[in-house]
């Protein structure tokens, strides 16, 4: 990939700042997962949710998450597949792995709205992550009378 001189200067400066930092706080949102290939519309949606697209006439995963399904079975059919591909499949591009390589030997902490588990899959320490919106891989009862969560992979 070829970059402009100005872009190269900025990335070199950023790399230098990271190398010389005592600590790093990373703030990340949906754009990072999108850059890693976790898109919620287009070809990825069509390949994984074509049956829902035809039956319910929505055209992206986000809309499907708010669709008023007639039955709990339809709701969970959608959400179980959604969680499978957005939590348990690896992202197509190594964006998170590359970010981890930049900070792995640093005192880092991550604050993220991403619920797709990509940080942990790339090697980030769970104790250094704060998921403000949770994790697709964990369930909690609908009347949270305790703080226990349940792994949903199986």
Model-predicted segments: where are they?
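Conserved catalytic core of sirtuin-type NAD+-dependent deacylases
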Residues: 1-154
